A protein has these predicted regions:
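Phosphate-binding glycine-rich loops and adjacent basic patches that engage nucleotide phosphates
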Residues: 10, 28, 66-76, 101-110, ...
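Acidic, small/polar-enriched beta strand-loop surface segments
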Residues: 1-2, 42, 56, 144, ...
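Short, acidic/charged, Gly/Pro-enriched secondary-structure junctions
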Residues: 1-9, 39-70, 101-114, 253-276, ...
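Charged- and aromatic-enriched interaction segments used to assemble
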Residues: 72, 77-192
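Solvent-exposed, well-ordered amphipathic alpha-helical segments
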Residues: 1-9, 20, 67, 82, ...
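Assembly/oligomerization scaffold segments
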Residues: 1-94, 148, 156, 170-172, ...
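Short, functional N-terminal and low-complexity linear motifs
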Residues: 15-18, 71-80, 107-115, 199-209, ...
Length: 299
């Protein structure tokens, strides 16, 4: 990894190799996060941005510095904590309003583009219905609410792009100690406690709750766990529960370049082949024991 700090004036400053570092991005967190400690020869002045490039010189993180610490005593150190641009959508409150026949392009122009995003991907047509942005909602919550309700998609904000297309990056990660990506450990985690067997939804006219979605996987496992909704998408709730109930973790030595949502597969002599996975979370870390990349894979 190569690290470059940026001053408020836009001047780039190459940072020395860090003593420790952690870079994490995942589908469940809108903003990617970085923390790092660097050796310090003299004060760097104010750093407001940080860029991180992987070993192929690809930009893998462009973040806003949330906290900068310079210290001496026990060694001179520069500590940085940063989040990706999506943090601006989390930190800013949306103006309460109601949209009639909302569209992705309208939501993007109002709630996302003003914070430095340059591109929007997804279905731009207008939808029947209304979207209400209530007091206290963040810009991210407003944009994500539209995507969830009308597009049935969880958006992703990265590299200046607000992506609500549902597309996945090309390529596939194959974790295999006999010819693929080497790993030090793999764990298959079945969390049966997270499954929902059925979801009932309340009728708007009669007020009666009726079955709206069922998980055949949960039923086949003998699981009975029901939820009742007054409003919301029952299928999305079932799918979300199924996704949380199964994951594979893989720890790999060194730096492993990858993209979120990339297809993945694990092959192990004892555990067998685990297919039809995708990258749900990636974490690169550097410390006293060297560097490693950890993955959470889901279906």
């Amino acid at each position: 990894m190569t690290y470059v700090g940026m001053t408020p004036e836009g001047v780039s400053i190459a940072l020395p190799p860090p003593v420790s570092a952690k870079l994490i991005c995942g589908e469940d967190a809108p903003a990617d996060g970085f923390t790092g400690v660097f050796p310090l020869l003299k004060s760097m002045g104010k750093l407001v941005r940080i860029k991180i490039y992987d070993k192929s010189r690809k930009l893998c993180f462009h973040g806003i510095v949330d906290e900068q610490k310079e210290s001496c005593g026990g060694g001179r150190k520069l500590a940085l904590a940063a989040r990706s641009r999506a943090a601006l959508l989390l930190d800013n409150e949306a103006v309460p309003q109601t949209y009639c026949m909302p569209s992705l392009s309208t939501i993007y122009e109002k709630h996302v583009k003003p914070y430095g995003f340059s591109e929007c991907r997804g279905d731009g047509r207008a939808f029947n219905g209304t979207l209400t942005v209530t007091k206290g909602m963040s810009e991210w919550q407003a944009a994500a609410a539209f995507c969830s309700r009308f597009l049935k998609i969880t958006p992703r904000a990265a590299d200046g792009v607000f992506d609500a297309s549902g597309g996945r990056p090309q390529g596939k990660l194959v974790f295999d100690n006999a010819g693929g990506i080497a790993y030090t450990s793999v764990c298959i985690d079945n969390r049966y406690c997270d499954y929902l067997s059925e979801v009932l939804v309340k009728s708007g006219t009669s007020g009666v709750y009726s079955l709206a979605a069922r998980s055949e996987t949960a039923v086949s496992l003998g699981i009975r766990r029901r939820r009742c909704l007054t409003e919301g998408d029952a299928d999305t709730l079932i799918r979300s529960a199924e996704k949380k109930a199964f994951r594979v973790t893989a720890d790999c030595p060194g730096e492993v370049p990858a993209d979120l949502f990339m297809d993945a597969e694990v092959r192990d002599a004892a555990l067998g082949a685990v297919e039809h996975l995708y990258v749900s979370q990636m974490e690169y870390s550097l410390g006293a024991n060297g560097e490693k990349t950890s993955f959470i894979l889901r279906r």
